């Protein structure tokens, strides 16, 4: 009987006006694909995220799930492949540690990234791994959260987090582990913001927040910046972006009017 396990981390350290997001400088990642030297079948080689068809499968699966959520989303960004996130994910998978990477190993430029892990005793398809994460939807109530204190929903909420639009994944064969196949996906910017996990997106008419930037129900007007504080909208209104403090700490609010962030 095949065994599957999964794990999730997608926590952006999020604080309000009293504090800041804690981060470190981005560490340049080197693509280091890992393939076992002996005895590995073609099914594993076919999972390599260096393959364009695999990248397309992963991105399309995520976008299909994102546009199909209930209630429908008005501000869900369309995901796209990111080579830096993929390199970070592959580097971490290659370590075969079966735990989550450090925050500094989950960054793309200035963005913090979330992370989903999936472990299997056989080379499952990427679509199956992603669907396994998404299936936590059955334990989730929109605007409420998990149906029970024990329910795990973090994989699902990361997949459907409205502002996470960059994705990169990697897979490794770990012969010393009982579950020998480790799948890692990283999502940027990270979802599962503390205090907001029960509302991973705004409900409403698909693309209601981006009527002029819509691709089959998903928004394409992403923002290249992030805000440091959760109340940047009110800070901008009160002090305006002429303030050095607001300009420095509320870059999305000041530079991304009309965009999703």
Residue positions per predicted region:
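Mature extracellular or exoplasmic CAP/SCP-family domains and secreted bioactive peptides
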Residues: 2-261
